[in-house]
Amino acid sequence: MVRSPTAEDIRSAYRLLLGREAENETVVENWQRLGSFDQLREAFLASSEFKGMRPGAPSATLVPLEAPPIDVEWQTDAANGAALLAHVRAVWTRLGTERPHWSVLSAERFQPENISESTREFYASGAQDAAMLVACLKRHGLAPAQFPRMFEFGCGVGRVTPYMAQAFRQVTACDVSASHMDMALGIVKGAGLDNVTLNLVQGAEFGMTGAFDLWFSRLVLQHNPPPVMAMILRRCFSLLAPGGVAAFQMPTYASGYRFEIAPYLQEISNAGGIEMHVLPQPVVLKIAAEYGCFPLEIWQDGAAGNTAGWVSNAFLFRKQAAHTAMNFSLGTNFRTGG
């Protein structure tokens, strides 16, 4: 009979593998839901924190504070917005069909020819995302029970969704790839979860059709052009309930990065791989302020990889109980486009 890890087993794993104590008891409880020692071990060994501790592991280099501004065109009209979204859908429909797991976590062991040996590790890694979110809430005296309607933007093949469904009363998740969604549905049904709804992203609603109390996205927004990122955030903040929280990650700076809509649209017919994009931090703050959302914390994380010159931020916003738009002006580097 397989014995599930106890709370003390989890604490010991933290001490032995990460050299520290667990953040709090909520994190310990989330790890216990993995159900087996094999899953626990694989999730810890696959974590970015453990990998960063290994001798010779690449370390992120901080971008200096004197870094120059970047030129990003982030607003557009409806026609160009639809063209950009159609491109994103085409890319991810193909990736979701050809290399579904690798398109979510781009490691060689998750390529189609290797996934049979690493499926358990792949899905176990989703526990870390849920644990990070719960810990993030905990730092501000908040708990999942306060946010019954949770929305996961970019659920992929269902790597994280089951863990979110264990922590939140009702979970709605979406993705732009139909093949991803089919696989996510299989994971949800296989786990016997009856509190999950899956929406396919088909237009400017981005799969968000009703209000929610908490919005979460990680390793997703960065693969969308800046105008699409901005459109997604506007939709998110507009539907976030008063007092609700938005927790998400995206790159906000990259040395030498530049984005112009017209040249990009002219070249997308030749593109087809995974793209990495940036939405500058002042733009994120401006959009949030327009919908009465204020930052609780902004952390620099390593979610964009250890590529030199890149900055990725983990944001936590909360919407005011009474929506009051806040004024926020931008400098000339952030253009509205047409």
Regions found by a protein language model. Give the residues of each.
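Class I (Rossmann-like) S-adenosyl-L-methionine-dependent methyltransferase catalytic domain
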Residues: 62-167, 172-207, 224-231, 235, ...
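Hydrophobic (often cysteine-bearing) scaffold residues that line and stabilize catalytic clefts
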Residues: 6, 10, 217, 280
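Helix-turn-helix-type domain boundary/helix-start signal
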Residues: 3, 16-22, 174, 210, ...
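A short acidic, Gly/Pro-enriched loop at the edge of an enzyme's catalytic core
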Residues: 206-215
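Composition-driven recognition of low-complexity segments enriched
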Residues: 1-60
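A short SAM/SAH-binding and catalytic strip from SAM-dependent methyltransferases
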Residues: 214-227
